[in-house]
Amino acid sequence: MSGRTLLLSPPSLSSQPERLNGILQSYDRKTTDLQMLDRLILGVVNLPDAAYSRIIILAGEEDSISESSKLTTRETFSHIARSLQKGGYICSQHEQQGQAFDHNEAVLVGLIPTDNGKFVKPDIEDMRAVPLRLGRKKHDKTISSNLAEPVRNHQASPTVAQDQAEDGFRYSSGRNIVTASAHETSDNEIIDEEDLLDGSELAAPIIQPPECRPKAGRRRRACKDCTCGLAQKLEEEDAMRRHAADKQLGAMKLSHGDLAEVDFTVQGKVGSCGNCSLGDAFRCEGCPFIGLPAFQPGEEIRLLNDDIQL
């Protein structure tokens, strides 16, 4: 079969360029691609669908395929199988069946094993459904007809048929076969949920269950599916507390007199990187001098009328 070839190499083989080049020389470089298994697992590389006629998993150190077998997980192997063309196959470098990947994983993704250790992707379009005609014995047909005889001869009484017809069931004439329509509904069966409770019931106070009542020394907690109103009440209390805390911890406003002089170069106040004086490009994320221009170490910085003066 003519087509492109994909070589999947374990990461240990990348440290042996001479051996890797020797393997590549045995394949046509114009129609051969090389990918690393670890990059495929991490999602750095995405293989195109139905692009290769054969995929070969290379051996690692000392011609061992155990490393490749550990890296080919179910998700990775499924992605590799999707990149095969119909009729293409996947195998190990030495065509040793069962060493480069698991048999079960190959079968689960739809590949068919062969005698030479290759797993072939079948051409589903060539497969057709074949009807199976199962013959029945004449004796069984006779028994079935005899069993159905009393049922056909049995007639439903008119009273029963009339009563059950009023319940929404229909009977075929002359037989006791019930055919009920699941889609037939009456308008009377639809109940408006707004009519279930009247005004007096809605105005009645909610009785709190004993398990929802607060215990001494503990904060009340609502049930997971609370219906007594405790969960809504606790949410309102928490919202009020957060609003009060945000109001107290509002943004601090400085007057014009408070901005007379601020020295940012206090001795001992430096960032963890030690590059605070070089500018924001060299400062770490938590540096106290972020936003200030570059300055000389020990230089005094003043803020007058919101303007930085060195």
UniProtKB/Swiss-Prot annotation:
Region (Linker): 131-203
Gene Ontology cellular component terms for the protein in this record: mitochondrial intermembrane space
Binding site for [2Fe-2S] cluster: C212, C223, C226, C228
Motif mapping: Cx2C motif 1: 273-276
Biological process terms in GO annotation: iron-sulfur cluster assembly
Residue numbers spanned by region N-terminal SAM-like domain: 1-130
GO MF, one example: 2 iron, 2 sulfur cluster binding
Cofactor(s) the protein requires to work: [2Fe-2S] cluster; [4Fe-4S] cluster
UniProt subcellular location: Cytoplasm; Mitochondrion intermembrane space
Region (Fe-S binding site A): 212-228
Predominant subcellular localization, coarse grouping: cytoplasm
Domain of life from the UniProt record: Eukaryota
InterPro entries documented for this protein: Anamorsin (IPR007785), CIAPIN1 (IPR046408), Dre2_N (IPR031838)
Gene3D superfamilies the UniProt entry points to: Fe-S cluster assembly protein Dre2, N-terminal domain
Region span, Fe-S binding site B: 273-287
Residues bound to [4Fe-4S] cluster: C273, C276, C284, C287
Cx2C motif 2, short sequence motif: residues: 284-287
Keywords: 2Fe-2S, 4Fe-4S, Cytoplasm, Iron, Iron-sulfur, Metal-binding, Mitochondrion
Subunit structure: Monomer. Interacts with tah18. Interacts with mia40.
Domain notes from UniProt: The C-terminal domain binds 2 Fe-S clusters but is otherwise mostly in an intrinsically disordered conformation. The N-terminal domain has structural similarity with S-adenosyl-L-methionine-dependent methyltransferases, but does not bind S-adenosyl-L-methionine. It is required for correct assembly of the 2 Fe-S clusters.
Family: Belongs to the anamorsin family.
Function: Component of the cytosolic iron-sulfur (Fe-S) protein assembly (CIA) machinery required for the maturation of extramitochondrial Fe-S proteins. Part of an electron transfer chain functioning in an early step of cytosolic Fe-S biogenesis, facilitating the de novo assembly of a [4Fe-4S] cluster on the scaffold complex cfd1-nbp35. Electrons are transferred to dre2 from NADPH via the FAD- and FMN-containing protein tah18.
Protein name: Fe-S cluster assembly protein dre2
Native species: Aspergillus clavatus (strain ATCC 1007 / CBS 513.65 / DSM 816 / NCTC 3887 / NRRL 1 / QM 1276 / 107)
Gene from which this protein is expressed: dre2
